């Protein structure tokens, strides 16, 4: 049996990424969706049952994680726990699960490196989309942009001008570029992180405006090392720009956070691209696109605090099955 715990963002896709391979591997599944967005999982279960899935194969439980998590994770019938969410919860699951297989994606602080030969016409909109779609509530969202000194002024002006044209509003409006945060509590947290960075010397280039749970896309520079925006996962519509003098410095700064999910580099040089591929300590390096580039056929996961194991159709199926050796002596 597989225990699957999913986050509030992309609730249908996240459930499908876990339920599909688990069922394909012959497992029963107990799915615990985020309490803020449970309806997608319930609709998925209904559609599968109406399509002929045998009773008991997919079981959806809803409620607060604090109340349901202990029972799900510690139950001896659950042989694998697959979880997408925060590091604290992931560490808690690791302690409670005992000797079980675990597959966990625990977040990121995704860096993008922009080198002097980068095509800024391509880089600027791609980075902005990767940073501010879903109000940054995406584990692959861009959080840090490491820009070479030689093009920093040009890039920052273009980037801020592009962000100024983004439309903030309701996610039900198809013209909206940046939607609201999932809750007032999360908006409070993101606002406090921006305030901390500003108090310690960061400069706001655009944004730092709030209306209810809507935080306008915010871009900062001179963010000091060690503040939360610099080294933790913001999970909000905030990007920090950094000057770097070389590719080597950019890679070193990209690697100094405790996460390693996705990173990206914009360059026309294959030599520089492969240097980044070899030296960035992450699960995926995206060349000339945003960190949020992903296809379901790709192995998805990271290094360090970004988690354990890999998702993606074939790779998740491998995680959710056991290898058995059978020998016949005839």
Task: Specify the residue positions occupied by each region the protein language model found.
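Short hydrophobic/charged patches on amphipathic alpha-helices used for structural packing
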Residues: 69-70, 124, 251, 274
